[in-house]
Design a protein with these regions (language model features):
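Mature extracellular/periplasmic domains of secretome proteins
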Residues: 80-88, 113-123
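A generic structural motif
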Residues: 96, 117-131, 150-154
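Soluble metallo-hydrolase cores and metallopeptidase-like ectodomains found primarily
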Residues: 58-80, 129-213, 229-238
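Noncatalytic luminal/extracellular "stalk/propeptide" segments of secretory-pathway proteins
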Residues: 1-92, 96-104
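Loop/turn elements at helix/coil->beta-strand transitions in domains of secreted/extracellular proteins
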Residues: 88-92, 122-125, 189-193, 238-239
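Extracytoplasmic/secreted cell-surface and envelope-processing proteins
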Residues: 13-15, 31-32, 101-110, 134-139, ...
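Active-site alpha-helical elements of protease catalytic centers
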Residues: 214-227
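Structured segments of extracytoplasmic/periplasmic soluble domains
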Residues: 2, 11, 226-234
């Protein structure tokens, strides 16, 4: 992407436009700005309290029978084949998330959702039930799974029969930015310290639930902005 001088004054770190840059880039983003509802046997659960919707979940509306997956099927070699056999086409499959993490995270950095959920074309919905509720994230919103995926804690019943789901999502092209700023060193301008941060766990999940990323990496961004403010007032020896 082309890097162009930024006109955002609060990012300014020097006296000339060449010292501050903004890089625009486009990327797909699964926007979940509409309905997010999960009703279990007539009881409406509370989004972000009783469950969280995974950020890659597509639009879905309907009622499904609930089934509970036996832990013996949480095998990386057979999981996808069994789940996609057709027997779960109109089912909401509840799986043991804690056991899933133990058996399916086969190597560091594995993208488990892409590896095990994206290939499934014959599953109505997936509910990952664990002891603790996984916080809402937005970092994996550049793709869709074929079905909605929910995270729930131990309060999710072990004997549910029906779930009603209403999720509104839209894959859009989003304008993102990389901000690049430069402060020259007072004694050794040819030598550099490079400080970087990323801020991707923010977003909207439903009409009234806004996440500012404070549960994850917005703290790193805040730290970097404070460092920039400090070094703007106190020029460092190194760039």
């Amino acid at each position: 992407s082309e890097i162009v001088p930024s006109d955002a004054g609060r990012w300014w770190s020097g006296t000339g436009a060449e010292l501050s840059y903004m890089q625009h880039f486009r990327h797909p983003l699964n926007a979940q700005r509409g309905a997010v509802e999960l009703i279990v046997d007539g009881k409406k659960l509370v989004n972000t309290v009783d469950y969280t919707l995974k950020e890659f979940s597509p639009t879905y509306k309907g009622e499904l029978e609930v089934v509970y997956l036996d832990n013996k099927h949480l095998d990386p070699n057979t999981f996808c084949k069994y789940m996609d056999s057709g027997k779960f086409r109109n089912k909401a499959v509840v799986l043991d998330w804690d056991r899933f993490k133990e058996t399916m995270f086969t190597f560091p950095g594995i993208e488990v959702y892409k590896t095990y959920f994206v290939p499934l074309k014959n599953v109505g919905a997936i509910i990952c039930r664990g002891e603790e509720l996984l916080p809402y994230f937005k970092s994996r919103n550049h793709f869709n799974t074929p079905m909605p995926v929910f995270m729930a804690d131990a309060s999710f019943p072990l004997d549910a029969r029906k779930v009603s789901i209403n999720v509104e999502a839209e894959m859009i092209e989003n304008d993102g930015h990389n901000i690049i700023a430069y402060i020259p060193g007072s004694k050794h301008p040819e030598k550099h310290f490079i400080l970087a941060c990323h801020y991707d766990h923010l977003g909207i999940c439903g009409q009234n639930d806004i996440f500012y990323g404070a549960n994850d990496n917005s703290s790193g961004t805040a730290m970097l902005l404070n460092l920039m403010r400090h070094f703007k007032a106190n020029q460092p020896e190194y760039s």
